[in-house]
């Protein structure tokens, strides 16, 4: 991927974020309690999550392995943090989910496209397009790096705890929907997504 392609995708993803933000005021995304047959074909929720999230983990792994700077300290640590997050989201979180919900195939495919682009753009920048000398070993001695690492693990802790709160809302056999009230949900509507946002501020 060249610099121009990267910049185009950066603008396209930013524009798409605005479009989706506005659209979701008028359209209910058809998963969870809003899943309806109108969304067409659907897949098992656990399978859908794995297929949707795994591409970003695999794309980043491929780009890292083929990079000449893959074992440089700073890029390598960024890579490990990134993969730690997405390994949990791709291969652990789905199998902890309870219930028999289904995910619309259309939403899963949109997630695949987003995650492929997410992995491509972050991996290409980190391992191929970043200016030479930007991510040197000296980066590891800066306060901003260690503050970012601390924020990453705080965010991950919030995310994991919030997911646990959601999983324990219902007793076995109960199919009703409940609003979580514990942990970060006392302060924000989506404690799990808030945790991910904090994680993403690591760099």
Language-model region placement:
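Small-residue-rich segments of transmembrane alpha-helices in multi-pass membrane proteins
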Residues: 103-119, 181-187
């Amino acid at each position: 991927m060249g610099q121009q392609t990267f910049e185009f995708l950066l603008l396209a993803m930013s524009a798409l974020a605005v479009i989706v933000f506005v659209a979701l005021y008028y359209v209910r995304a058809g998963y969870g309690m809003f899943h309806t047959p109108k969304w067409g074909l659907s897949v098992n929720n656990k399978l859908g999550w794995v297929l949707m999230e795994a591409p970003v983990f695999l794309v980043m792994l491929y780009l890292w392995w083929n990079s000449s700077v893959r074992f440089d300290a700073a890029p390598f640590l960024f890579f490990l943090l990134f993969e730690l997050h997405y390994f949990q989201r791709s291969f652990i979180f789905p199998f902890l989910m309870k219930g028999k919900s289904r995910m619309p195939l259309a939403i899963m495919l949109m997630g695949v496209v987003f995650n492929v682009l997410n992995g491509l753009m972050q991996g290409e920048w980190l391992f191929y397009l970043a200016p030479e000398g930007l991510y040197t070993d000296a980066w590891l001695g800066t306060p901003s790096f260690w503050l970012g690492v601390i924020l990453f693990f705080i965010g991950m802790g919030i995310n994991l705890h919030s997911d646990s709160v959601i999983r324990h809302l219902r007793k076995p056999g109960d199919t009703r929907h409940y609003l979580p009230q514990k942990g970060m949900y006392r302060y924000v509507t989506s404690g799990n997504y808030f945790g991910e946002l904090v994680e993403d501020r690591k760099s």
